[in-house]
C-alpha cells in the first residue's frame, strides 16, 4: 500500500512493510472486513475493542488498543458518532487512513435519552443520529460495499479481490434478508419494547414498531418514572414480549416482566464477539437467532 504508512507505526522489518494491517473499531466492522479481505495474502485484520458490557459510547481505550492502533495502516470505523472514544487520540495518527463505513447512508435521527427524566442522571452523548446502522441488513450491505470500495481505492493491487469477496458476502446477506422478510413480513404482532436504541434500523427494515425504549447504562438505572411509563405502554398496548440485549443486565426487564406478565427475550445487535476466524459467519448466525427469537416472541 503506497503512501499509507502511519507515522506512529514502526518499520521493523521488510516483512512488516509488505503486510497491510487493517484495524477495525469494533465487532460488526471486524466481521464485514474479515469477509472482504478473505484469502488475500499479506492483509491482516485486527479488532481493537474487546467484548464488553454496555454501550460502545462509554468505551475507554486500553493500552493494548493504542498499541494496535499505532501499528495500523487503515482504520475502519462505523462512524455516525459510534466511535466517540477515539476523538481524543485520533489526531495523533495523522497519516492513518480512515474508512467510515456509514458514509453516505441515510441515517435515523437519534432519540436516545430524549425520554429520560431529570432524575435519571448520566452523561448525554449528544449525537444527532442513531449510529446502529449495521443492525439493518440492507444498511449493513451498504457498509460492506463502502468498505470494499474504499479498500480498493487505498490498495488498488487487491481491488479485484476486495470486490469479489464483498460481492460473495453481500449475496449471503441478501439471502438472509429474503429469509427474514419471508417470516417477519407475515407476523401479526409487530409492537415491541426494547432496552436500548440499537434496533430502529432493524425495525424500519422489517416493519416492526418500537413502541417503547428503556435505556440501560452500566453505571446507572432508569428512573422510576421511566419504568412506570414503560409499564403503562405495555399494559395499554397488551405487549407480550420485552427484548433485552446480551451486553446489558436484565434486572430492570425482570422487574417490568413481573409487573406486567410480559416475557423476556434477547435480541443481539452484534456489537461484541470474539475476534477470530470463526467470526466470518457470525453476523448471519446471530441474525438467524434473532429471527427465531422474534418468531417465538411475536407468535401469540
State each model region's role.
Residues 4-300:
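Extracytoplasmic metal-acquisition and chelation regions
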Amino acid at each position: 500500500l503506497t503512501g499509507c504508512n502511519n507515522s506512529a507505526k514502526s518499520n521493523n522489518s521488510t516483512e512488516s512493510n509488505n503486510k497491510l494491517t487493517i484495524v477495525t473499531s469494533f465487532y460488526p466492522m471486524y466481521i464485514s472486513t474479515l469477509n472482504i479481505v478473505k484469502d488475500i495474502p499479506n492483509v491482516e485484520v485486527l479488532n481493537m475493542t474487546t467484548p464488553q458490557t454496555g454501550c460502545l459510547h462509554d468505551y475507554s481505550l486500553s493500552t493494548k488498543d493504542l498499541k494496535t492502533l499505532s501499528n495500523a495502516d487503515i482504520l475502519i470505523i462505523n462512524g455516525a458518532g459510534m466511535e466517540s472514544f477515539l476523538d481524543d487520540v485520533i489526531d495523533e495518527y495523522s497519516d492513518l487512513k480512515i474508512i467510515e463505513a456509514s458514509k453516505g447512508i441515510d441515517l435515523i435521527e437519534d432519540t436516545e435519552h430524549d425520554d429520560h427524566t431529570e432524575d435519571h442522571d448520566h452523561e448525554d452523548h449528544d449525537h444527532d443520529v442513531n449510529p446502529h446502522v449495521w443492525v439493518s441488513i440492507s444498511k449493513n450491505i451498504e457498509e460492506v460495499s463502502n468498505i470494499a470500495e474504499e479498500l480498493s481505492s487505498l490498495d488498488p493491487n487487491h481491488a479485484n479481490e476486495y470486490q469479489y469477496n464483498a460481492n460473495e458476502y453481500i449475496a449471503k446477506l441478501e439471502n438472509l434478508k429474503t429469509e427474514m422478510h419471508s417470516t417477519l413480513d407475515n407476523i401479526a404482532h409487530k409492537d415491541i419494547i426494547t432496552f436500548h436504541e440499537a434496533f430502529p434500523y432493524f425495525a424500519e427494515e422489517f416493519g416492526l414498531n418500537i413502541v417503547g425504549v428503556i435505556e440501560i447504562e452500566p453505571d446507572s438505572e432508569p428512573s422510576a418514572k421511566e419504568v412506570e411509563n414503560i409499564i403503562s405502554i405495555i399494559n395499554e398496548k397488551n405487549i407480550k414480549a420485552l427484548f433485552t440485549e446480551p451486553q446489558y443486565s436484565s434486572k430492570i426487564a425482570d422487574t417490568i416482566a413481573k409487573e406486567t406478565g410480559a416475557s423476556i427475550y434477547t435480541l443481539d445487535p452484534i456489537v461484541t464477539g470474539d475476534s477470530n476466524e470463526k467470526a466470518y459467519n457470525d453476523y448471519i448466525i446471530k441474525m438467524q437467532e434473532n429471527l427465531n427469537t422474534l418468531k417465538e416472541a411475536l407468535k401469540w
